[in-house]
From Swiss-Prot:
Zn(2+) binds at residues 388, 452. It catalyses: 5-amino-1-(5-phospho-beta-D-ribosyl)imidazole + S-adenosyl-L-methionine = 4-amino-2-methyl-5-(phosphooxymethyl)pyrimidine + CO + 5'-deoxyadenosine + formate + L-methionine + 3 H(+). The gene is thiC. [4Fe-4S] cluster binds at residues 532, 535, 540. It is an enzyme of class 4 (lyase). GO terms for biological process: thiamine biosynthetic process; thiamine diphosphate biosynthetic process. GO terms for molecular function: 4 iron, 4 sulfur cluster binding; carbon-carbon lyase activity; zinc ion binding. Substrate binds at residues 190, 219, 248, 284, 304-306, 345-348, 384, 411. Catalyzes the synthesis of the hydroxymethylpyrimidine phosphate (HMP-P) moiety of thiamine from aminoimidazole ribotide (AIR) in a radical S-adenosyl-L-methionine (SAM)-dependent reaction. The keyword Ligase does not apply. Pathway: Cofactor biosynthesis; thiamine diphosphate biosynthesis. This is Phosphomethylpyrimidine synthase. It comes from the Bacteria. Keywords: 4Fe-4S, Iron, Iron-sulfur, Lyase, Metal-binding, S-adenosyl-L-methionine, Thiamine biosynthesis, Zinc.
Amino acid sequence: MQNIKSFMQFPASKKVYVEGSRPDIRVPMREITLSPTKTETGIIENEPVRVYDTSGPYTDPDFQPDIQKGLPPLRKRWILERGDVEEYEGRPVKPEDNGFRNGKQSEITLPFERKPLRAKKGKTVTQMHYAKRGIITPEMEFVAIRENIDPEIVRQEVAAGRAIIPSNINHPESEPMIIGSRFHVKINANIGNSAVTSSIEEEVEKMLWAVRWGADTIMDLSTGKHIHATREYIIRNSPVPVGTVPIYQALEKVNGVVEDLTWEIYRDTLIEQAEQGVDYFTIHAGVLLRYIPMTVNRTTGIVSRGGSIMAQWCLAHHEENFLYTHFEEICEILKTYDIAVSLGDGLRPGSIADANDEAQFAELETLGELTEIAWKHDVQVMIEGPGHVPMHKIKENVDKQIEICKGAPFYTLGPLTTDIAPGYDHITSAIGAAIIGAYGTAMLCYVTPKEHLGLPNKDDVREGVIAYKIAAHAADLAKGHPGAQRRDDALSKARFEFRWNDQFNLSLDPDRAREYHDETLPAEGAKVAHFCSMCGPKFCSMKISHELQKTVREEGMKQKAKEFVENGSSLYR
């Protein structure tokens, strides 16, 4: 892996911290330094621009990263001082946790020495539990500063179930963030190995790469060997919440034979991942036996991996989905560690032909029912959504979700707005993501150019994250989120003043912006030129606008001088 600190840095940027009500609440931000504006009358300084920062300690000059040691436990003191958790031995790691059986063992030895925490008997340790009792936790204050919003609003939104702060007590390394319609639209990046490709180092590097470009959460969707070890390395080194789909690992434990899945194996997998520090689980508890026939005449059937696994299990056993029948027990586990549940849309449409159909909305009704059960346990909930939806059908998805799930945060995969662009589905889906985000969706799951084609690599992760940062920011602008437009205004001003380096540095992808500019005008002098290669020096509209403004100012001065003479050379009448 290349030097972490070097590839995590952004140009003309520095890490700054805003301190809260206590010294250990230090909220990170990235401050972008701007060059001054040069005018005919002198120099005007431009204030630096502070932006939301997901890069964690990796961009702090005082921090020396070591993947073998992980990140410092930022939240550990906050967790322990509440007095409602206890340390315990935890379950031993088994060969099948890493995909091995028949006596074989993983050759990977984990370097992290830690014992897991859990709630003391009779205690609930979720942020929702505290919020309902009127407590503003350090985590809530942290996100309030990050979002430039009052901490009491954060508490109210979490208490009402309209926002979640994913924060497993066994992932103290994560910096608190919030998912809800009143806050910045967040994005998730999926990573993870498969049975045919990738390694632990590659997945850790993908995680770092994703948070460098702005991913707010990570989902580890590993399905190959070393699942447990891969996840441990990712969590210990992740400054953002980590989610998983536990049914994937449970299926690996039975060698991929769906019929052999049991509640006991799934429950053991939940506890295994809870002890590691997974912050939210996608659980496909809404795929009910009676809904499966509704998918038979679909163009693309059931496209969710988790949904198809549970549908196959239900049909094989002629029984109801065990995730549904054991949901109360699942909530008992979740509230013991403060793991949020992301209620999976196992029957989401996989083509625009199937959008908003009977199966999709039948499952949504069940997710609404499960939301209320989770809230009864003070478990934080978000609802997963589609998928593939043409633009004119997007609003109906949001309206139904808000009504049925009582305002629980909506978390959507796109949606893709057309099916004809394999290789460009980061674009087809970012269109839908911007629209659904503007309507109130709280988090957008990115789609990479490799969607439907293969496992994304590091470059695909970058493309997907940037596409979705654009969509999320566009949605923030549409929602009128406080301060969202400041970066746009700063970049527009830099563009009009031909401050090329400031334009690059204020952009979501400074490297790409600089690279494209320098393909045709690489000389350093071009960074102050009043034109680019698109129009050249004679046809640049902004250069012409400057000349027009200068002319108007000069004409205005001439007019004022004329009025001065006509008024008897008196300043006052």
